[in-house]
Swiss-Prot record:
Gene this protein is translated from: vma13
SUPFAM superfamilies per record: ARM repeat
Subunit structure: V-ATPase is a heteromultimeric enzyme composed of a peripheral catalytic V1 complex (components A to H) attached to an integral membrane V0 proton pore complex (components: a, c, c', c'', d, e, f and VOA1).
Entry superkingdom: Eukaryota
GO CC annotation: fungal-type vacuole membrane; vacuolar proton-transporting V-type ATPase, V1 domain
Keywords: Hydrogen ion transport, Ion transport, Membrane, Transport, Vacuole
GO molecular function: ATP hydrolysis activity; proton-transporting ATPase activity, rotational mechanism
Membrane topology, as annotated: Peripheral membrane protein
Annotated PANTHER family: V-TYPE PROTON ATPASE SUBUNIT H (PTHR10698:SF0)
UniProt organism field: Schizosaccharomyces pombe (strain 972 / ATCC 24843) (Fission yeast)
Protein localization: Vacuole membrane
Protein name as it appears in the record: V-type proton ATPase subunit H
Recorded family membership: Belongs to the V-ATPase H subunit family.
Amino acid sequence: MSNSDLELSNAASPPPVELDNSQVDEIINNVRCVAIPWQGYQRSGSLEENELQEIENLTGKPLSAYVKTAEEDTTAYSNLFLKLLSMKDTPDVVNFALVKLADTLLNSNKFLSAFGPAFYDFLEKDESYINYLDDDSKLLFARVFALCSSSSPCSVAKAFTLFLEYLGKLMQSLNPLTRLFAVQCLNGVLTLKAHRYALWAENTCSFRLAELLRNSIGDTQLQYYSLFCFWQLTFESHIAQDINKRFDLIKLLVQIIRSDTKTKVYRLVLAILVNLIDKAPKDTISTMLLEHVDKAVQLLQKRKWADEDITNYLDFITSTLDESSKHLSTFDMYKSELDTGILHWSPSHRSEDFWHQNAKRLNEDNYALLKKLFHIVQYNEDNTSLAVACHDLGAYIRSYPEGRSLIIKYGAKQRIMDLMSHPDPEVRFEALSTVQLLMTEVCFLSKITL
């Protein structure tokens, strides 16, 4: 099975631009109830007579009627909406425009295609537009921005970055509906390749998305939309190669598989795994074996699934991992674990035979793997990773005594000594054990000198 056969509908998704959210719906309903003195704006010169007529064509009529009206003259009504959006000092007018505009965009692909480029031209002249709006207006603006960006790539880099930063802030909200809305908006814009790479380069928003997914157990909708964002990201090979290193995503997917969740969530998790195998096999398959994805998937295979796609995903993942396990050596697995930057107590770490056979291999390619251990010890904040890295450096010099000088040369000795006072007892123990091995050599050399 090739992942190129997968379509958007195959992940059991609603149209990503629907953005159904009761919090935002309440704001929209309130906006619809506001009476705006349009004739007063026309008399004051804020609106032209023809613009007043166009506004009247949008008010007091069924949705289908005013959408049809806007479709008949996309240029005129695009200009009208942008004119109303430019009236930032009149929030009621801006909100009216944002609500009517979203209605039209949601129900007319023709208008969506025509309005997007004009909207970006508008933002080109006012890149920080979102910053001038009040909280409710920002939510409505984000809705319109997501709709436009689901259809055509945003050509205003700063405006898109500000949009992502805004979504990142919403993801930190204490209100679960606000967090959900942020992920729904992000889900909409990620339908386009350019926006996937823009999100990946921006960093902050994607990290908050990952944090939301980690904490989404029990919130099926948030979990689902968060996973859908990751699924779209993994269609890009460059992103798929790095996504597990950045977020430890495979481990998280295994946790979700082992939880009791909805079929649509399992479906997305499996689709992400298929993408990772298809787009970045060298970077992900060995990690999947380390995280026991094969065993987790086997648990799902014991269930009866009415969904044929799920059974196909399960069969593909199982057969691929089974075949790969026959060809990957223990050292290949260890190397892949180091590549992730996140270490676990897998069997190779405590195996004396493994270190006797492979310690010198850490020196290959200008000490590439050894330097990765140094980097983990120096910068990683995960307690288990720190403990395992300290242990591995001790095992390395136990099997390759000459390695002591390398640990000192690259500055890792002082860091390991510092870790002897780490708050985690396992980290302290492994750091102490490795320091003892380092100091044993120092004492031995001192005696020789004397």
